[in-house]
Amino acid sequence: MTARADRLVDAMGELESLLITNLTNIRYLTGFTGTNGACIVSRDERLFFTDFRYVEQAREQVAGFERIQAGRDMLADAAKRLRGRAGFDDHDLSVAAHRKVAEQVPDGVELVPAGGLVERLRAVKEEGEVAAMATAAELSTAAYESLRERGLTGRTEREVAVGLVRFMEDAGADGASFPPVVASGAHGALPHAVPRNVEILRDTLVVIDIGAIVDGYCSDCTRTLATGSPPDGALELYALVRRAQQEALPAATAGAECRAVDRVARDIIDAAGHEEHFGHGLGHGVGLQVHEGPRLGKTAEGALEAGNAVTVEPGVYLPGNVGVRIEDLVIVTGGEPRILTGFPKELVTVG
């Protein structure tokens, strides 16, 4: 964790100190998993603040920082320790919290918006982070495999969703990285459909999007399964989405512009006449959060770096009819990406 704080200092430029209040960023920098904390990083000091409830937990988890038990107002206590040109996370700090900080900083301190500094460090994964995500991806793959035995037909979408989460937790996951999507038939045309108490029928497609958490790190994987003979046009739609993903995966390489990677899949889907049916971006970063930077989309800024963990997930959604999405979690390298999610991508039929 100390090395991460060192890298943050290197990225701070002219800032003399930086106040971090986002709990995910705090976990990344310190290892603290509690629900109340703040930290300050400068060239001379590493300070961690929490309240009485978490003092012992911080003693076990937080190393390389001076641990400080805050009084009744932790944010005010932290603000008093800021120095010089002081950055704060404007992506996280509310207007009211910013006002409080501004009232408490010592004379001469200049507060400067500095959101995104820690997030940019988080976007490039270390070996241990990749290992945790790979394990989380293996658990989601195993959950998909369990459906071959348990089946889908006759079970409700909600029953399947609950069962997948229970399977991953029983296999060692800390939990699900997001509420699962299990969407059958026309419900699959909703990209983030909520599982219903509705039985899954034969001869339809089912979009399933699941992920696990291991040591705080997330996985994310979508597969579209069949429960028999798919309806007319569904096989062609599946083949289209699969081809778009197959072409986009090798484009996700270090140095590639994020919007250019999106364009590879989007051009294929657009050319097939489904421009209006692919309304989301191609992918997003994954790590301590299931949605983080970088983003792959039509208007995405920046380029991929080696060590980025991103999803590649084209989809086509026909309202009132059917939906198809195929998603892999990959680690960006200088060449072909490393794919962490292993369940087959040819159309799998599950009874």
Predicted ranges, named:
Residues 1-351:
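Active-site neighborhoods and metal-handling regions in enzymes and metal-associated proteins
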